UniProtKB/Swiss-Prot annotation:
Gene name of the encoded protein: argG
Positions bound to L-citrulline: 99, 135, 139, 192, 201, 203, 280
Name of this protein: Argininosuccinate synthase
Residues that coordinate or bind ATP: 17-25, 43, 129, 131, 136, 194
Compartments it resides in: Cytoplasm
InterPro entries: Arg_succ_synth_type2_subfam, Arginosuc_syn_C, Arginosuc_syn_N, Arginosuc_synth, Arginosuc_synth_CS, Arginosuc_synth_type_1_subfam, AS_cat/multimer_dom_body, AS_multimer_C_tail
Pfam families assigned to the protein according to its UniProt record, in alphabetical order: Arginosuc_syn_C, Arginosuc_synth
Length: 446
């Protein structure tokens, strides 16, 4: 039995993820006058460009919602964001600059918490503003059905009647005006923006062209660090972690993780830290481009990674990074709560994050230009005296190293044998600067 409804279910309760913007406002009112019983659910995700959440449900009632609820998702959003950080669940990067999966984390929280609220109200049909070409339509589909297996999906933007009657923003604005709401269409930007407390995404329109860059974006979580007229003073900040959790900034302890992340956003934002320009693969394997902001997560990640590399051994770090990339991809695909993701999360949080206790001091300059200037932890396995070139009490002697190097003869001989085989079958060509001719000579005894 299909879970997707292509036509408006007249006479039935329909929940809509309501942002208060033109699209969802017009959709809600249209559903009401066409005979559905709409319920509006608004997620408070701490969006930096939203200043009056309490007014949003009131507007929904005015537009025809039978009921409207504001769901505070901030604590859960930050909890999932810190979990992603602890696991390094970030698979998209360009030249070492990371995208922190802030939109996928937000969708995991919104998709579960709003559908749970709808279920409490006996609403088993859900609509949202995601389009059929994007990632969110699949993310919301998965998370919604995880919470409510009886859920049906109705999206106005997949309903041909809605598209025919209200196919664009100009038509929606006129529709609302004729209904007596005097809804003024906001000025069109050169790109679209989606944000939450963790970060902001700028994409589409002019940003679809790779000839348009970060300079056309007006940051909403920080400063335009590329502009010469923007003055940015260098700043030192100390971040403290306890058992993998960020607990203090500049010596100020935070019991509330939301408050800590807000302060981290302010600090990082003053420098434009955490902005990146990424080309990525959507779930459907088509490439898209986004410009991202995440000043607070970027600041915390610098400190967390520094402590991870100072505390854990090489093989643990390798597993942390490999599993983090795998987990990041699952998160991006809307599988944050799938068993394979939970297994990877549990491993990293238990065996990597729990050992991460300490402080890191960072000097921030412009954009992603920074220096680590101090690292302190009771759990450091970095011990300079082990490798000091000075005359100190060493943990091993020159003769110990001679023995260790002698044991390497076994695998070196193995490697030479394999190189001879590869050369004989033509897999390796001996060039003038290559050592392979010498290997051939050795075969003849010279």
């Amino acid at each position: 039995m299909t879970t997707i409804l292509e036509n408006l279910p007249a006479g039935q309760k329909v929940g809509i993820a309501f942002s208060g913007g033109l699209d969802t406002s017009a959709a809600l009112h249209w559903m009401r006058i066409k005979g559905a019983v709409p319920y509006a659910y608004t997620a408070n995700l701490g969006q930096p460009d939203e200043d009056d959440y309490d007014a949003i449900p009131k507007r929904a009632i005015q537009y025809g919602a039978e009921g409207a609820r504001l769901i505070d998702c901030r604590a859960q959003l930050v909890a999932e964001g810190i979990a992603a950080l602890q696991c390094g669940a970030f698979h998209i990067s360009t030249a070492g600059v990371t995208y922190f999966n802030t939109t996928p984390i937000g969708r995991a929280v919104t998709g579960t918490m709003l559908v749970a609220a709808m279920k409490e109200d006996g609403v088993n049909i859900w609509g949202d503003g995601s389009t059929y070409k994007g990632n969110d339509i699949e993310r919301f589909y998965r998370y919604g059905l995880l919470v409510n297996p009886d859920l049906k999906i109705y999206k106005p933007w997949l309903d041909q009647q809605f598209i025919d009657e209200l196919g664009g923003r100009a038509e929606m604005s006129e529709f609302m005006r004729q209904a007596g709401f005097e809804y003024k269409m906001s000025a069109e930007k050169a790109y679209s923006t989606d944000s939450n407390l963790l970060g902001a995404t700028h994409e589409a329109k002019d940003l679809e062209s790779l000839e348009s860059g970060i300079k056309i974006v007006n940051p909403i979580m920080g400063v335009a660090f590329w502009r010469d007229d923007v003055k940015i003073d260098k700043e030192e900040v100390t971040i403290r972690f306890e058992e993998g959790r960020p607990v203090a900034l500049n010596g100020v302890e935070y019991k509330d993780a939301v408050a800590l992340l807000l302060e981290a956003n302010r600090i990082g934002g003053r420098h434009g830290l955490g902005m990146s320009d990424q080309i990525e693969n959507r779930i459907i394997e088509a490439k898209s481009r986004g410009i991202y902001e995440a000043p607070g997560l970027a600041l915390l990640y610098i400190a967390y990674e520094r402590l991870v590399t100072g505390i854990h051994n090489e093989d643990t770090i390798e597993q942390y990074r490999e599993n983090g990339r795998r987990l990041g991809r699952l998160l991006y695909q809307g599988r944050w709560f799938d068993p394979q993701a939970i297994m990877l999360r549990e491993t990293a949080q238990r065996w990597v994050a729990r050992a991460v206790t300490g402080e890191v001091t960072v000097e921030l300059r412009r954009g992603n230009d920074y220096s680590i200037i101090g690292t302190r932890s009771p759990n450091l396995t970095y011990q300079p005296e082990r490798l000091s070139m000075e005359k100190v009490q060493s943990m091993f002697s020159p003769r110990d190293r001679i023995g260790q190097l002698t044991m390497r003869n076994l695998d070196i001989t193995d490697t030479r044998d394999k190189l001879r085989i590869y050369s004989q079958v033509g897999l390796l060509a001996a060039g003038e600067s290559s050592a392979l001719p010498k290997l051939k000579e050795d075969e003849s005894g010279n």
